[in-house]
Amino acid sequence: MKLKKFFAGVLAAAMMLTVGATAAFATTAATTYQDQSEVEIYKHYGLEGNGTSPEETFYLVQADKKVLTGDIKDSDIPDLTALTNAPASTDGRHYVASVKFGEGGAKANDAENVGEFVVKLPTYDHVGKFEYTLQEVAGNTAGVTYRLDTIKLVVSVINDGAIRVAGVHTENEGGEKSSSFSDNKYAANTLTVSKYVSGNMGDKKTYFQFELSLEPGTANGRKNFAENYTITYPTNGSDKNTTNTIVVGGASVKFWLKSGESISIANLPEGVEWTVSELDADGKAVANGATNGVYTVSVDGANGSIVAAGASETSNKASFTNTHEGTPDMGVILDNAPYIALLAIVAIGGVALMLNKRRRDEE
């Protein structure tokens, strides 16, 4: 019994020492804060679909500030240090950070698409805990998604203003706190228009004319597009294909294809709408199921909009199939059967007469 009491006492003493050491360590750790003059906020710029993002600069502005703890008013909190290379027109907003991605900077792999905002902290005359609300400026580039949720930057000022400790909260409502976010993406894909000819009388060497137009689409509104987009024609295609680019929201483009050929237009932002038609000899659009000369035209995807995320095998494609079935002309065919039968009857009759005459002569 005495031995049990002894071990119990040793265990209790060990637990007290452990708790005391933990408390002492916590007290010591609380005094090792380092002053922060700036805060880094990491941004991932993702890619959806099959495209190349244009050069893009993202900006953060200070939208609000407030005192969480302290004896000063919200208006007395110093603003975050202003960005030196802010846009010429700020619309009265207080720009505090930017990050630039070059052409093709959007990547599907998060390890390759990271950039950072660097927010510089001001000097403080008062201790306290202050919260800054940061907002990403929504740009106007077609295909780019901008972050809508705000970012909370909390600065704790201690030791009579000598030390600034910052924490970044990029969470959505009820989400996890983080100094990194992946809300931004570039979404684009390639449009393909193809031609096919079928049927035993179909001529696969005949060229057919088409007309294509591109519009921004409801989802893109008045966003900015590239000056133009390159049309890739088939190798050794028609000499009539002389228009090499097309403008979203601009004039339509006409081109020629024969069976088995396609054109493609790459890097069209998601939501861009296309309309493409096959033209008859008079330059009029041929409807699905109608005829173009001797051909019946079947159309799949004459109208549509560019899909990036979740695109299927049939997305972003338009195909035209012209069918001509017929019976080959074999020339004039004479039916000799009646004549052959008549000759056979005459021959049989002649043989019968000859045999009958011989029989009479023998009698």
Predicted segments with their positions:
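Solvent-exposed loop/turn and edge beta-strand elements of beta-rich ligand-binding domains
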Residues: 2-363
